[in-house]
């Protein structure tokens, strides 16, 4: 087959000398040319080691007769920007990463691509860009960091910080936690957004089998990176191996069933629909709700479970999860191996993959003096932790387009409740009220004007952690927002409330003392009373209509720059909050 790179060499005589000036040799010019795009940078632990993996990818490309060119667009860290205005840039950065991949790939001719990232916005940004560019491609997950001493992992820092603020621990204990929570590179060691999205990449068939959430310190990760380079060259010379040839609605349904099994981050409801949109496939919150109902929740890993994320790989990773839910999966979907999902799963049973995982698990047991088995981490299908998936889409007069709750991380006491509304127009005000004990048992705390168009849709992590780490509030109040939550968040938190406040959604009309009904099993989120008194739904509709007459749209928060662009063009959270032009 004719390679795009070689056709462009004929049209652009300056291309060869420019390549040579960049370090290519003359004999490299006629090879399969592969763009190796990563989020490498000193931005955070998930990207700091990717340059090492990039070089392994390039070695694999060379071994298969190709040449790999390095491109970088680093990502930001939600953890580093948490609690500051910097977090407002997080979701917008996903769009910019995808845009830079489009620019890099289309401004210069390439025959294939390999993409490397680890974390919250890097992985979905890579997958969106990969779909948009649509050249034969392989994604390489950057792996997970190890847990620290006492199995300390980063999501526990919010709890430590809240305890320190309340005077429950001293500064020395807080400092110990800070110095030991991130002992290596890789994604944070819990099933937050970073880990979830690595798993989604593999579940979609865009990464090599068994590569998601490998420990970043493992030599196996280097070997898989090299194999990804080889595979990119192979599929560049095959017919019908572009991402659009591989990924269908069936692939996305597989991924969502895996999401249910791992109790994945709610941010996946922003990212999978945005990735699907690039493939011309429509996925909404309703798709998640439909597939999560009656799905098995199997993974006993933090934040909803007990163990660090590295244990996920030691128990067999994505393939082990898929084996447990195999009867519900589309096994005939294609993957980047050039084989179907079913063929990949059978091959892993015979190539020593699971035996190697077991060896790593035994080393983990020695390190922490525990005695875990695979079944302690990934439950068998018939011994599932839960049988109703892990998330639910709630609807009602408070969220006509929907809102999301991760019910596996929510106390059962809060599944059906009526609470008093306490609205705040910023997270800072709300967090201050929680820490100063101005929020009481039975309150429904609202943080609004924090949606995509309002402020960029930041995470409400500190507030959610302050609530969930309080023994009384964590089981007696709810946090409802048009913003989003960290993948590490636990407790009675409801996000993505749509339409958002800045668009005049009902969340903007909530007043102090309104009665709020939450019913997770019936998927309801309603205002059912005013000033502490129950009203009929007809009366509520009339009152909200009257309030709307007095509501005034807010002036745009951002006047220029990236956030101005994002706030003007972001789609609804229920669609994925991607840029609509």
What residue spans do the PLM features occupy?
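A short, small-residue-rich loop immediately preceding and capping a beta-strand
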Residues: 105-126, 138-141
């Amino acid at each position: 087959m004719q390679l795009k790179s070689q056709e462009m060499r004929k049209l652009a005589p300056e291309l060869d000398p420019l390549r040579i000036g960049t370090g290519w040799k003359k004999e490299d010019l006629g090879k399969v040319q592969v763009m190796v795009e990563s989020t490498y940078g000193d931005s955070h632990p998930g990207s700091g080691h990717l340059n090492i993996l990039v070089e392994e990818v390039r070695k694999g490309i060379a071994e298969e007769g190709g040449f790999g060119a390095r491109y970088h667009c680093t990502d930001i860290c939600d953890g580093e920007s948490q609690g500051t205005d910097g977090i407002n840039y997080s979701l917008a950065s996903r769009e910019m990463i995808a845009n830079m991949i489009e620019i890099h790939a289309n401004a210069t001719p390439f025959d294939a691509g390999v993409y490397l990232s680890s974390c919250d916005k890097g992985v979905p940004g890579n997958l969106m860009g990969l779909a948009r560019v649509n050249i034969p491609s392989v994604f390489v997950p950057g792996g997970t960091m190890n847990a620290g001493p006492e199995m300390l992992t980063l999501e526990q820092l919010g709890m430590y910080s809240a305890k320190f603020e309340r005077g429950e621990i001293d500064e020395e204990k807080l400092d110990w936690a800070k110095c030991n929570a991130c002992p290596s590179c890789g994604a944070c060691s819990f099933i937050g957004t970073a880990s979830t999205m690595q798993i989604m990449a593999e579940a979609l068939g865009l990464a090599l089998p068994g590569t998601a959430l490998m420990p970043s310190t493992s030599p196996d990760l280097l070997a898989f990176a090299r194999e990804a380079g080889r595979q990119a060259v192979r599929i560049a010379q095959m017919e019908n191996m572009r991402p659009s040839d591989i990924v269908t609605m069936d692939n996305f349904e597989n991924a969502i069933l895996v999401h249910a099994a791992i109790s994945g981050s709610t941010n996946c409801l922003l990212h999978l629909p945005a990735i699907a949109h690039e493939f011309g496939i429509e996925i909404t919150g309703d798709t998640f709700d439909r597939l999560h109902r009656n799905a098995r929740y199997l993974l006993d890993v933090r934040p909803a479970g007990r163990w660090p994320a590295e244990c996920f790989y030691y128990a067999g990773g994505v393939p082990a999860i898929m084996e447990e839910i195999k009867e519900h999966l589309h096994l005939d979907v294609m993957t980047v191996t050039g084989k179907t999902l079913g063929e990949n799963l059978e091959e892993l049973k015979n190539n020593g993959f699971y035996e190697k995982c077991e060896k790593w698990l035994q080393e983990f047991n020695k390190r922490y003096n525990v005695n875990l088995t695979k079944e302690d981490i990934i439950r068998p299908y018939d011994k599932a932790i839960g049988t109703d998936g892990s998330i639910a889409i709630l609807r009602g007069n408070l969220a006509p387009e929907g809102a999301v709750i991760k019910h596996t991380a929510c106390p059962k006491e809060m599944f059906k409740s009526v609470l008093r509304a306490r609205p705040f127009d910023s997270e800072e005000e709300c967090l201050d009220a929680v820490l100063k004990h101005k929020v009481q048992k039975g309150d429904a705390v609202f943080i609004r004007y924090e949606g995509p168009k309002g402020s960029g849709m930041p995470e409400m992590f500190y507030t959610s952690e302050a609530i969930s780490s309080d023994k009384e509030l964590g089981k007696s109040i709810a946090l409802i927002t048009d913003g989003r939550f960290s993948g590490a968040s636990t407790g009675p938190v409801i996000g993505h409330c749509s339409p958002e406040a800045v668009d005049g959604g009902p969340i903007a009309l909530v007043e102090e003392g309104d009665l709020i009904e939450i019913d997770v099993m019936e998927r309801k989120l309603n205002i059912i009373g005013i000033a502490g008194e129950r009203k009929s739904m007809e009366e509520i509709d009339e009152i909200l209509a009257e309030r709307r007459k007095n509501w005034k749209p807010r002036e745009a928060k951002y006047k220029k720059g990236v956030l101005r662009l994002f706030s003007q063009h972001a789609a609804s959270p229920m669609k994925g909050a991607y840029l609509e032009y």
